[in-house]
Amino acid sequence: MVGLPLCGCAELPKLEHEPLTIMTGCRDYSALEKALKEEYPEVNLEFISYNGYNTTSYFQRLLEVGQIPDIYTTKILPDPALQKEHLIDLSGYDFSAKYAVSRLNECSVDGSIYMLPCNFSVLGIYYNKTLLEKHGWEVPTSFYEMEALIPKIKAAGLEVATTSLEYIGSAFQYLFNLGDTIFLRTPEGLDWADDFLAGKVPADNAWASTLPYVQKWIDLGLINGSWCGKPEKQAAEHFAEGNTVFFVHSGGFRYTQNTDGTGDRYGLMPWLSIDGSNNRYITSTACYFGLSADLELPRNKQKLEDALKFMSFISTEKGQRLLSGDSTQFLPLADSEAFPNEEYRDIMEQLNAGFSAPLAYKGWEELIVPVGEACLNWYAGKSTGKQAIAVMDRALQSSLQNGTASCAVLPEDLTLEEAAQLVGNAFAKAVNADCALISLGGYHDGKENKDGVNGRLFQGPVDDVIISTINPLGWVNTIKTVTLTGQEIRQLAKEGFDLYGDGKPFPYVLTLSEGVKLERERQYTVAICGCTAEIMEKGDLQETSICGMDALRSYLSALP
């Protein structure tokens, strides 16, 4: 019989709470993790690296196949049906009540809230506040007021507007921003968008009231077609010269004439509706956060408690400031003092009153380029609004008919290592290499590896979008090779890719082409993804002309 010591006064070791998993998604959570630990020492986070080229599509794919981490993040709100199936309804928890109603409405799915927003930027039309004050002009709050102001601007020898029109996406965005003030954000407009993207209704009738309005913006010089194709930087610099009242821009901009805070002061106004009753600021949310429905399983009771603490923490101003996004962005919280001056409090009041529209155009991705090109021609006076909408109809039909063709159907899920092996086989075959060394993604003390395979593949059809989620070369980069001996290859495969030179390498997956057996002193051509400067020099790194996407597409298409 073994005697057990009496230890009633001794403290038993505390079991650590099982960590909550969260994918990095090209974000740095180190500051958030540190602050969370100070607030809730018992809560542990485990970071799963994804630093690939298509975060949005990969995270969407994880949701589709039900393989999400405990804490799920995404840049674009997912399909409502997927949210209902895989995420927890957060609407009944106290922390959800801390968010502004307008932000919750953006996330609502039939009255439930499965994802909560983090900080966001606000886009609109910049104006030179100093010029307006100098001439005694009020900031217009409707298009009627804008129409009345423009003759005064011209009479004073000032330019009405500079418009950023370098990019096709900007031209597309301006059309939709003005559409948001007329029809698109109405219940009928939202229904139309769903029906249109499904191919059930045409575009022309829905845009009938918006096109004349956009044309007025063009005619008055607010959308200034003379800037079509000119560099965005040049447009910004021209506005900053101080002789232009408005800057129509698709992104953010500073609020003073000079970068050091001196010179003219700028303000931000919404996209104006005709009578001012439906003005719209455009919001771009940095990220949304939700919790996996698996946390509600009985075995995950402790993890659920910790996950709710995490959500409670990020639902505070302190937590929001530590999330992804610029520190000057707005917060989605109802009682947040996002900025210390009256102007930005006014913006928040308008946002909270519902005078906003999201920037993300989910479902429109295939139409942005053709419609944006048509809009550029329209703004430049080379075509009409009706022609642009006709392009929208044709582009939608082409997208529906052609879709994104699948090049293979996988019979089962692949692990990260198996996905890397597939990439290695594809790259080696494409460039006639003897073998391949493909590094893996990972998370080492906040450091990640973008040069390697970061994602898995799952059972089912594989198209270009899915390929892009695992391709370490992105959409256009080409395959690189080195020449090494068999011994050097084996040694690298054993040691891994020491990207940061800190002795914490990322693993390699070694694949050999058919019939190849590595001999110690013989030299071989190696397709490689992720190598140090030393290996680049030793192996005489060469860049081939073969695109990684083409290689993967060809390899997958040939699979049985």
Regions found by a protein language model. Name each.
Residues 194-228:
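Glycine-centered hinge/linker elements that transmit conformational signals in sensory
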Residues 38, 46, 135, 220, ...:
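Extracytoplasmic/periplasmic substrate-recognition and gating elements
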Residues 114, 123, 147-199, 244:
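Extracytoplasmic/periplasmic solute-binding protein
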Residues 75-124, 138, 147, 173-174, ...:
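Hinge/lid segment of periplasmic solute-binding proteins
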Residues 401-560:
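Catalytic centers of hydrolytic enzymes
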Residues 96-131, 160-165, 277-282, 354-363:
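A structural signal for short loop-to-beta-strand junctions that line the ligand-binding cleft
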Residues 28-29, 325-330, 345-398:
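C-terminal capping/gating helix-and-loop segments adjacent to ligand/active sites or protein-protein/ligand interfaces
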Residues 2-79, 86, 139, 277, ...:
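Conserved N-terminal structural module of periplasmic/extracytoplasmic solute-binding proteins
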